[in-house]
Design a protein with these regions (language model features):
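C-terminal structural segment of proteins
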Residues: 37, 42-44, 86, 91
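Feature captures the catalytic cores and cofactor-binding loops of soluble hydro-lyases/lyases
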Residues: 57, 61-65, 92
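Small residues (Ala/Gly/Ser/Thr
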Residues: 10, 27-28, 40, 58, ...
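C-terminal binding/interaction regions
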Residues: 2-19, 69-136
Length: 136
C-alpha cells in the first residue's frame, strides 16, 4: 500500500469521529506486515478522561482481533494546517507493540511528516523496566 493510500484510509475514518467537544476529527490507519490495515477514529466523552484517540482505537481493534505484532506503520490525519502527531499516551501504547513503527502524519493540504516512533518517544518506558524493578 502506498503512503497516499494509507493516508486515504485514515482520512476516511475522520467521518466516523465522535467529537462534539473539540470538533477536531482525527483518523488513523495502522498497517501490518501482511497488508492488513486496522482503522480508527477519535471518540470523545463528557468525562474527558474517557476519550480515546484514533491511534489507540486502531491499535485496540487490532489487539481485540488477536494481533500482537507485525505493525509496520500508522497514518494519522486531522483537519489542521499543521501535522497531527500522536499524543504521548498514543506513543506509549504504540511502543508496547511496535517500537519500530513508522508514523506518517498528514496535514490538511496533503503534506506528509514521516518519523519513527523511536524519534517521537526516545528512551520510552517499557516492560523491561518492570522486569528489572525490585518490588519490595
Amino acid at each position: 500500500m502506498t503512503d497516499q493510500e494509507l493516508i486515504a484510509r485514515a482520512r476516511e475514518m475522520q467521518k466516523y469521529a465522535y467529537v462534539p467537544y473539540s470538533r477536531f476529527p482525527v483518523g488513523a490507519a495502522l498497517e501490518c506486515d501482511d497488508g492488513t490495515v486496522y482503522t480508527g477514529c477519535n471518540v470523545e466523552n463528557a468525562s474527558y478522561g474517557a476519550c480515546i484517540c484514533a491511534e489507540r482505537t486502531a491499535l485496540v481493534k487490532a489487539i481485540s482481533d488477536g494481533r500482537r505484532k507485525g505493525f509496520t506503520r500508522i497514518a494519522v490525519v486531522g483537519n489542521s494546517a499543521g501535522f497531527c502527531q500522536p499524543c504521548g499516551i498514543c506513543r506509549q501504547m504504540l511502543s508496547e507493540f511496535a517500537p519500530d513503527l513508522e508514523i506518517l502524519a498528514a496535514d490538511a493540504s496533503g503534506r506528509i511528516s514521516r518519523h519513527s516512533l523511536r524519534e517521537l518517544l526516545p528512551e520510552s518506558f517499557g516492560s523491561d523496566a518492570l522486569e528489572n524493578s525490585s518490588n519490595g
